[in-house]
């Protein structure tokens, strides 16, 4: 699973996701992509599950680019612990995704296979997504 090798701080504020994505909103590498349509936190486990679904459906043909990286730690207190006594220990890593952000890109497969693979990947994510394709030039 993806997580940073080294961070400046161990814990992060909860934060809010405002506005729409300006960077990472267009296809940069592949011919087809999966674009987020809502603001959401996506965990490293969910990204990995989507990646596996993608590559398995494509039968390891073509190429996959993951355009997001989970760099925000989410802390959690243990079960049955009283409130107070500070913030909990880091539990998982997430990425804050704004609407319009491209999550995955693929290339080297047909349009039908790409759409099916990205639909399977989208089912693993807690967010509404849209299939996008590069306009034929």
UniProtKB/Swiss-Prot annotation:
A single GO cellular-component term on record: cytosolic large ribosomal subunit
Alphabetical list of InterPro entries matching this protein: Ribosomal_uL16 (IPR047873), Ribosomal_uL16_bact-type (IPR000114), Ribosomal_uL16_CS (IPR020798), Ribosomal_uL16_dom (IPR016180), Ribosomal_uL16_sf (IPR036920)
Family the entry assigns: Belongs to the universal ribosomal protein uL16 family.
Known function: Binds 23S rRNA and is also seen to make contacts with the A and possibly P site tRNAs.
Gene name, Swiss-Prot/TrEMBL: rplP
Gene Ontology terms for molecular function: rRNA binding; structural constituent of ribosome; tRNA binding
Presence of keyword Membrane: no
Keywords: Ribonucleoprotein, Ribosomal protein, RNA-binding, rRNA-binding, tRNA-binding
Name of the protein in its database record: Large ribosomal subunit protein uL16
Assembly mode: Part of the 50S ribosomal subunit.
One BP annotation, GO: translation
């Amino acid at each position: 699973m993806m997580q940073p090798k080294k961070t400046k701080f161990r814990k992060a504020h909860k934060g809010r996701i405002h506005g729409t994505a300006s960077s990472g909103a267009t296809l940069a590498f592949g011919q087809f992509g999966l674009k987020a349509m809502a603001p959401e936190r996506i965990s490293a486990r969910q990204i990995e599950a989507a990646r596996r679904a993608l590559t398995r459906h494509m039968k390891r043909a073509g190429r996959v680019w993951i355009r997001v990286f989970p760099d925000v730690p989410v802390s959690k207190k243990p079960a049955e612990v009283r409130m107070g006594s500070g913030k909990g220990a880091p539990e998982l890593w997430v990425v804050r995704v704004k609407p319009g952000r491209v999550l995955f890109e693929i290339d080297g497969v047909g349009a039908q296979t790409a759409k099916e693979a990205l639909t399977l990947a989208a089912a693993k994510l807690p967010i509404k997504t849209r299939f996008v394709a590069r306009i034929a030039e």
